[in-house]
């Protein structure tokens, strides 16, 4: 039997993303649509890539009847060496059943009661960061009243 090498998660970067409160579009046939047209005010990235998150990103959320939230965020990082990297970060957030009503009311739920994972992808014209196109990444996130905290791992 051939043993396939198991993937390893290597810490890549930590992001602190300053966000605005959501604008709720309302109940649609798919669920409660919350859209934040320009939620990202600023932020930082530390780790293998260092820099700042530029204002003006977009984030949309679909909150389903079972409490699951589908997330899609897009924003731009300006690295410390003045390169630009576009990030598209899709994922899910599921709150433990006992806390779903509070979450639906906009309350921040303690992270131990929330499964919040993402799959970020990167695009850049920078030669320095072209390698980001050829790697897979996953993220683990936490929401605070004003920030999304995101730790990204490279899948090796």
UniProtKB/Swiss-Prot annotation:
Domain of life according to the entry: Bacteria
Residue spans crossing the bilayer: none
UniProt xrefs under HAMAP family: UPF0311
Assigned protein family: Belongs to the UPF0311 family.
Annotated protein name in UniProt: UPF0311 protein YveG
Organism expressing this protein natively: Bacillus subtilis (strain 168)
Classification of source organism: Bacteria, Bacillati, Bacillota, Bacilli, Bacillales
Gene name tied to this protein: yveG
